[in-house]
């Protein structure tokens, strides 16, 4: 699978600071056992899976306003 970069995600979340916060929070959720929203996530680290979810449009800035 191709590498994912933050540039792949800026179409969904244009603010780099928000992108970092969303990716970190989602990676923490994945690390704590939440189910990944993309296929083939088991071979990736939680941070990579979080970025893939953002790039696919499954996760956005609404994660920052929801309760943990």
Curated annotation (Swiss-Prot):
Promotes RNA polymerase assembly. Latches the N- and C-terminal regions of the beta' subunit thereby facilitating its interaction with the beta and alpha subunits. GO terms for molecular function: DNA binding; DNA-directed RNA polymerase activity. Its EC number is 2.7.7.6. InterPro entries: DNA-dir_RNA_pol_omega, Pol_omega/Rpo6/RPB6, RPB6/omega-like_sf. It catalyses: RNA(n) + a ribonucleoside 5'-triphosphate = RNA(n+1) + diphosphate. It comes from the Bacteria. This is DNA-directed RNA polymerase subunit omega. GO terms for biological process: DNA-templated transcription. SUPFAM superfamilies: RPB6/omega subunit-like. HAMAP family: RNApol_bact_RpoZ (MF_00366). It is an enzyme of class 2 (transferase). The RNAP catalytic core consists of 2 alpha, 1 beta, 1 beta' and 1 omega subunit. When a sigma factor is associated with the core the holoenzyme is formed, which can initiate transcription. Keywords: DNA-directed RNA polymerase, Nucleotidyltransferase, Transcription, Transferase. GO terms for cellular component: DNA-directed RNA polymerase complex. Belongs to the RNA polymerase subunit omega family.
